Amino acid sequence: MPKAKTHSGASKRFRRTGTGKIVRQKANRRHLLEHKPSTRTRRLDGRTVVAANDTKRVTSLLNG
């Protein structure tokens, strides 16, 4: 049986940490930021851990 391919879209969006958690970027921080409050853009900064419900699905896309 051939090797399973990693989902290329998922590999660009998700990353595995050293401890095995899966992290993602937060949405709504790409463009049209002029009218959004600074507090909101700061809150959307950085990465966050993927919800426990979604981890199984994301892991299968990443071949893990």
Swiss-Prot record:
Entries under Pfam families matching the protein: Ribosomal_L35p
GO molecular function term, any single one: structural constituent of ribosome
Residues making up the signal peptide according to the UniProt record: none
Keyword annotations: Ribonucleoprotein, Ribosomal protein
GO biological process per UniProt: translation
GO CC term (a single one): cytosolic large ribosomal subunit
InterPro entries assigned to the protein according to its UniProt record, in alphabetical order: Ribosomal_bL35 (IPR001706), Ribosomal_bL35-like (IPR021137), Ribosomal_bL35_CS (IPR018265), Ribosomal_bL35_sf (IPR037229)
Annotated region (Disordered), positions in chain: 1-22
Keyword Ribosomal protein found: yes
Alphabetical list of NCBIfam families matching this protein: rpmI_bact
Family from the record: Belongs to the bacterial ribosomal protein bL35 family.
Descriptive protein name: Large ribosomal subunit protein bL35
Gene giving rise to this polypeptide: rpmI
